UniProtKB/Swiss-Prot annotation:
InterPro entries per record: AddA, DExx_box_DNA_helicase_dom_sf, DNA_helicase_UvrD-like_C, DNA_helicase_UvrD/REP, P-loop_NTPase, PDDEXK-like_dom_sf, Restrct_endonuc-II-like, UvrD-like_ATP-bd
An annotated Gene Ontology molecular function: double-stranded DNA binding
Protein name: ATP-dependent helicase/nuclease subunit A
Keyword terms, alphabetized: ATP-binding, DNA damage, DNA repair, DNA-binding, Exonuclease, Helicase, Hydrolase, Isomerase, Nuclease, Nucleotide-binding
Summary of subunit composition and partner proteins: Heterodimer of AddA and AddB/RexB.
Amino acid sequence: MSEVKLTPEQNEAIHSSGKNILVSASAGSGKTFVMAQRIVEKVKQGIEIDRLFISTFTKKAASELRMRLERDLKKARQESSDENQACRLTLALQNLSNADIGTMDSFTQKLTKTNFNRVNIDPNFRILADQTESDLIRQEVFEQLVESYLSGDDGLNISKEKFEELIKNFSKDRNIAGFQKVVYTIYRFASATENPIKWLENQFLKGFETYKSLIDLSADFSADIKENLLIFFELLETSLTNGVVAKKGAGRDKANLILDNKNELLEAITTKDFATFTELFLSIDTDIRVGSSKDEILSALKKDFSVQKQDLVGSKSKPGEIRKFVDKIKHGQLIEKYQNQAFEIAENLQKFVIEFYQSYLERKKNENAFEYSDIAHFAIEILEENPDIRETLREHYDEIMIDEYQDTSHTQERMLELLSNGHNLFMVGDIKQSIYGFRLADPGLFLEKYKDYAKTENPNQLIRLKENFRSRGEVLTFTNDIFKHLMDEKLGEMTYGKEEALVQGNITDYPVESEKDFYPELLLYKENTSDEETDESEVRISDGEIKGAAQEIKKLIEAGVEPKDIAILVRSKSNNNKIEDILLSYDIPVVLDEGRVDFLKSMEVLIMLDVLRAIDNPLYDLSLVAMLRSPLFGFNEDELTRISTQGSHDLRFWDKILLSLNKEGQNPELINPSLENKLKAFYKKFTEWRKLVNQVAIHDLLWKIYTETYYFDYVGALKNGEIRQANLQALAVRAESYESSGYKGLFKFVRLINKFMEQNNDLASVNIKLPQSAVRVMTFHKSKGLEFDYVFLMNLQSRFNDRDLKENVILSRENGLGMKLIADLKDEADVITDFPYALVKMETFPYMVNKDLKQRAALSEEMRVLYVAFTRAKKKLYLVGKIKETDKKSGLDLYDNASLEGKILEDKFRNSSRGFQHWILALQNATKLPIKLNVYTKEELEAEKLEFTSQPDFKKLVEESEKFDNIMAHSDEIQKAQKIMNYEYPHQAATELSSIQTPSQVKKRSYEKQLQVGEIQPKSEFTRVKKLDFSDFGPKKVTAAEIGSATHSFMQYADFSQADLFSFQATLDEMGFDEKIKNQIDIAKILTLFDTDFGQFLSENVDKTVKEAPFSMLRTDEFAKEQYIVRGICDGFVKLTDKIVLFDYKTDRFTSSSAISEIKERYRDQMNLYSEALKKAYDVNQVDKYLILLGGPQQVFVEKLDD
C-alpha cells in the first residue's frame, strides 16, 4: 500500500494538524495505512512516539498497528537522508514497545494502577475477565439484597409490600427471574454511561417526568400517521376518477364520506386532539370493496387499490397502519389512568437498582476484582477530581488518536474529552460500519461530529476517504445501489449520497468496465414446505441453502480458487454445526471461526456433567443411571433392570445398588457373578471419586476420571474425536477457572452449570488445530476488518432479532426508563370477568417513546451490518436466501409493487423486521439492481449433486489409468521416489518385528543391545499410562511438547522470503493456536535465524525448498536380520543442482555450548537416516545436514553436523 500513490484525501489525513480532525474512512480505503503514516510523519517532525495517545478497538488491532509501525519506521529510516530525522526514527523504534498503543481498557487500567490512592483501591486489583466469576458474585449480591427486602428489614428504602409489588410487575408467580433480568439490564446500561450513579439518579425517571399523557408525546409519534392519511386520501381520490371505485354504489358513498372528513381528521392529528381523531375515524366505515374487472388494466388497478388499502387501513382482525395508530391512542387513553401507579413502581425500581449497583461495587472492592467498566469509571474519577493529573496528561500528549471511532461509547468519549486539550483529536472511523450497538457503542457521537465538522464555519476538519482499494467495481456498484436507496436520516441515521458512495480505487488489479461473471449473485432456494420442516421464525437455515452455496463453492475450488479465499458469513453461529457437516459432505475443508455450538449439549460433556452430578449426589437417579449406562461403565438395559428389581419402585437407585452388592435385595438371584463383579468395580471407583471431592480440585478430579476410565481416549476415536476431546478439556478448564476465582465445591459448580443450561446459555467454544486452507465460516460482526475474494452471505431471509422491543424495560440515555406495567383492570367499565382480577400488561408512555427510538436505531444498525458484510468481498458476492413454494406472500410476487419514494425505498419495506432478503428483493423490483438471480429447487440441487458424486465410466477410467502409468514410467522424479517407496518385504518370517518404525524408534533400538531376537516386541510411540501422578492431571500449563509442536507448525507455514515481524505475526495469528500456546512462540527470536548466513540462504532459496518432507525407506534389523520400513518426516531440505541441504528444527532447551554438543549427538542418527533417504531418492552423493536450534535463551543457533 505504501508504494501506491496517495490520494489527495489520504495526503490530507496524513499531514493536516492543529485542529480536531475526523476521518470518515469508507470500507477498504486504507485507514490503517493512513493512521500509521500519520504517526511516522509525526515522528519525522520531531514528536516522540510516546507523546502520542493511540487508542484501538481491540488488542489484536493494537498489535497489528504496532507491527506495521515497526515496518514503516524502519523503511522511513532507510529512505531518510536527514541524519537528525533518522535518529528520531531510530528512537521511535526503540520506544515503540512502550508507546501508548492499545485499547482504552488497557490505558484506564494503567492510569488507575498508577493513581490507585486517588480512588481508594488496592493497586493489585485484578480484572473479572471470566464471565462466570462476575455472574456468581453478581448473583450472590442480588440474592442477598432481595432476601433483605423480602424479610422486611428496618432501614430499607422500600417496604416489603411495595417491594413485592415491584417484583410482581416483572416476574411470573413466585419466580423472580424476570425481575432479576430487568435489574441486570439496567445495571449493564448504566455501566456504559460515564457516571452510572449520576445517570440513575438524574436521568432514570426522565421519561416519566416528560411523558405523562398522549399530548406530551413528540411529533414523531403522529408524523407517520399523518403521512399515511395523506396517502390514503390520495388513493381514494385517484380511485374515484380512474374507475377503480364504481360510479354508483356503497363503495363510492363510503369513499366520499371519508374525503368529506379529510380536513377534520388532519386537523385533529396536527393539534394532537387524539380523542377527536379516534372518535371520528371509528365512526366512518372504511370497508370499501371494489370487486374485479374483465378489463386487464382495470383489474390490475383494483388489485393494487385493495393491497394499498389493506396496508394503510386494514380491518379489525388485521389492522393496517392507521388502525394500529388508533389502537395506540385507545391504549394511551387507558394508560393515562395508571400513570401514577407506574411512576411509583419506577421510583422503587430506581431505588433498588442504585442500592444493587453500590452493593455490587462494594463487594468487588472487597474481592479486589473489578469489571472493565469499573476501571473506566475510576479513571474518569481520577481525571475529573484531580486537575494536576489531568493537566499533566494533557501536556504530555501532543495528539489523541482514536481508531474505529464510530464504535465509541460515552464512557470512552468522556475519557477522550478529559485527555484532549480541545484541538488535538484525530478520529478515524466509518459511521456505515458502526455495528456494536449491543455493546452500547453510540454511533451518534460520530454522526454529531460528522455533521458539525462538515459546516464551513466549523474550525475542525472533516476528511472523507471514499476510494476503495479492496473490491472490484461490480461489488462497489451493487453496494452503492443498495444503500443509496435504503439509507436516509429517518432510517439509517444518515443519507448515503455522493459523498458517502464507494469509489473504485484499485484499477491496476481490477478492470473499470463491469464483467457480468462478477456481478453479485442472489441464490434463492425455493423450499417445498412439505419436504422440509419450516421454522416460522426462519432463524434456522435450511439444508437447501447450504447445499446451494456448497455447490457454488465446489465450482470455485475446481476452477482453482483456494478455499482460504472464500468466506461464509452468517447472522449467528447457531447454524455452524449444520454448515460444517454439509460442507464436509462435499469434501470442502471448512473452519468455524467461532466454533461449533451447543458445547454443553454435546454428548461427551453431558455424560461428564451427569458423572459430576452423581458424585455430588448419588441419590439423583437420573444422573446416576445415565453414568452407569454411559461408556464409562457400560451397564446395559438388562443389567440395570436386574438392579432395579432389588427394591420397591420408590426406592432410590443408589440404595438398590447397595442391596445388589450385599445380596439383600428382593431378587438377589438376578445378580449373577458377572454383574456382581461389574458392580464391585463400579462401587470401588465411584466411592474413590466421592472421597476425593473434598481433597482435590474439580479440574484434577475430571482428569482422573478421564484417564482412569479411558473416556478421553474413547471419545477421541469417535467421529470428530479431536473436537470431542477439546470439549472435555474445555470443561476441565472451566472448572479450573471457577475454582481459581475463589469458589470451591462440586455442588456450586454443578449448580452453576445447571443454571447455564436452564437459561440456554453456552460456554466458550474450543479451539483445535485447523486446516491452513479452508473456507471460513463466521458471523457478520466477526468479519469486520477482514477481506476475502469470494463472500457468501447466508440465511438472508432470517428475520431481524426484535426481542429487545418486547422486553419489560427499554432504556434510552435521554429518557431513562421505559417499562411495561401490569395493571388490574377489574374496575374498568367495559371489562367483564368472573375472576377476582383482570391483569393486563401495558406499555407506558416512556416505553412507547423508547421503543420507537430503539426500533429505528436497530433497523439502522442492521443496514450497517449489511454494509459491512457486502464490503468484505474483493471479487464476488453471493447472497443466499430462501422463498417458500407454497406461500406466495413469502415469494417473489410480494415485491411486484415495490417502488421508490423519491430516491428511497418505500417505508413499508424499509421499516420492517423481515430481514435483509426483504430489502434486497424490494429494491430489485424497484430499481433493477446489477445482480444475477438464481432460483433453485431441491430436485435441481440433487441433480447437480450427482455431477459431483456420479459413478465414473470404468472403461474410460482404465484407459486414462494406462495413459497415466505410461507417463509415470518415464518420469525421472517418480522413478527416484519409487526406489524408496516400492521396496517389498522379501521375508515373511519377521512377524515379531514392528514392520514400520520411526527414526526415533530406530535410534532407540541402536542402543538396546541387550534385546534378543525372540524378545523383540512391536513398539508404539504412545504408551498408555493407567495411573497418572495426581499433580500431572490435565493440561494446567502449556507443555514444552505443545510449544515445540506449535513452533514446528509455524516454521512450516512461515514464508521465509518475507522474514519480518509483520508477516510472521500475521501468519501466527492465522494459524488458530490457543492464546497460551501462541504467546510462547517467540517471533523476535525466530527472526534472528535470518540474521545468520544460513537464514539468508533459506530466504534466497524459497523456490527450491521442500518443507515437511515425508519419506519411507527399507532397512534391515541388525538383530532379527529381517527388513522393515522406516517412515518419517524431515522438517525440510533445499534441493540444489549438485547437492541437498537438509535442515531440521529442534526446540530442546539449552544454555551452554556443551548442551549444544549434546543435542547434536542426540539427533545425529536421526539426521543420518534423513540423509540416507534423500540420497537414495534423488540419487545425490552429498547431503549437508544442519540443526536449527530454537531452544536457546535469546537467539537461534544453526549447527552443521559432520558425516
